[in-house]
Amino acid sequence: MAEALASQLNKAKLGDNGAETKWKEQLKLPPKDTRTQTEDVTATKGLEFEDFYIKRELMMGIFEAGFEKPSPIQEETIPVALTGRDILARAKNGTGKTAAFVIPTLERTNPKISKTQALILVPTRELALQTSQVCKTLGKHLGINVMVTTGGTGLQDDIIRLSDTVHIIVGTPGRILDLASKGVADLSECTTFVMDEADKLLSPEFTPVIEQLLSFHPKDRQVMLFSATFPMIVKSFKDKHMRNPYEINLMDELTLRGITQYYAFVEERQKVHCLNTLFSKLQINQSIIFCNSTNRVELLAKKITELGYSCFYSHARMLQQNRNRVFHDFRNGVCRNLVCSDLLTRGIDIQAVNVVINFDFPKNAETYLHRIGRSGRFGHLGLAINLINWDDRYNLYKIEQELGTEIQPIPPSIDKKLYVYDTPETIPRPIANASTERNPPAQLAQSSDNQNHRQAHHISGGHGQQTANRGHSLRGSYRGGRAQGHRGGHPENNRTNPMSSRSNMPTSTTAS
């Protein structure tokens, strides 16, 4: 169906004359992203956004956000979604799934109708914030009101906002069900129902909530499911709640082609030393370091700070306002390194991240796939390094087999061409709010000399309070500096194997 639509659209291209394209010249476009892209996003049919016959105001938002041409998942999804048909779409992490459902949702929303017309469900609060910002940015010329609502925030604020017109609601299932059950959120005319990361949303903890939410929608709703992985429970949902869905599967392989994967065998007590060595050898723009528990997240963040590196951390037990601040500031390039639990494995799109480190190796292939997908976003290059101990050997083999991928032993030196770009200033922060940008990732890659001379300090709560006592009042962010050497992963001309050296440095992150 998508190929037939593409053929028809190619026969009737819009915007071929000067009058039609002149409006483009008035747009305020961001700097062009000149990085090489893989076939994950370049293997398209050659369609343009104009070929979808969408509103000019929407196209203005699309181009001003830095989009140039639709990716494969967008080419397949958008024309079908615009017809109102149910969709079940499977595509890799970081290939443009969010825009694939946001664009048709915005196009089909009528700003003149003062009712909620679309509901977008996501599994985590951070992903809700990110997705709502995508909606607002792409739809900024449409006059559409977008609201984000998640648990961990005041219900009264949501009630006040819903007293005004809200066209699109983005949020987590529990909070939206609470609002709908109380009669605060009126979903009686909400004809678009979208689930991102659908495999997670249809897990046993969420499924009853999802089915209750559907009961508040009209019978003739459009249901769209998007994910990188679809377990059997998704088929059960499809058979029960979807009408002849159009199925899209772009998963000819599971892992992104631009991500190079390595493992290093290392004793548990030497992991922090190994991480320190990697920081000094790799040219990191931004990195995400994953741990398997919230306790280890905080312990590792503290240890990294004591080594002299700037570091934020985030996990599910933190206050929501602190999680939001960490996510916002890391996305805007305030800090180079983020330690987190699997809270941020789902859908989070920070294009400046070029290195992911599994400090703790994940227990299953699904988690591994989502973790390493935080680098190599939208067809770009990235590096995934796994610190493996003796007990992880079987999981390493099992994950390789399940994903059909090869995780190689880490070499004495890693070619920068695998994950570093010569012009880091071109790396965009998609959907960033220019008024809140502080220190972009491009500057991160160039400002180590200034940062090396900063005094080590811990930021408690907001960024205004600083204290030299790193060990107390931990609330989501550590900042560190070192008087000498490199900070945050700058290259040295030392080609020794990061795994070859040993240290007796004590660590607070030994396995429990």
Swiss-Prot record:
Query: Which PROSITE patterns does the entry link to?
Result: DEAD_ATP_HELICASE, HELICASE_ATP_BIND_1, HELICASE_CTER, Q_MOTIF
GO MF term list = ATP binding; ATP hydrolysis activity; RNA binding; RNA helicase activity
Q: Hydrolase: is it a keyword of this entry?
A: yes
Native species of this protein? Coccidioides immitis (strain RS) (Valley fever fungus)
| Catalysis performed (reactions) | ATP + H2O = ADP + phosphate + H(+)
Q: What does this protein do?
A: ATP-dependent RNA helicase involved in mRNA turnover, and more specifically in mRNA decapping. Is involved in G1/S DNA-damage checkpoint recovery, probably through the regulation of the translational status of a subset of mRNAs. May also have a role in translation and mRNA nuclear export.
Taking every annotated instance into account, which residue ranges of this chain make up the domain Helicase C-terminal? 258-418
Q: What is its EC number?
A: 3.6.4.13
Residue span(s) of domain Helicase ATP-binding: 78-248
- A Pfam family that this protein carries is DEAD
The entry marks the following residues as binding ATP, namely 91-98
Q: What is known of its domains?
A: The Q motif is unique to and characteristic of the DEAD box family of RNA helicases and controls ATP binding and hydrolysis.
Q: What protein name is recorded for this chain? A: ATP-dependent RNA helicase DHH1
Positions occupied by motif DEAD box = 196-199
Instruction: State the superkingdom.
Output: Eukaryota
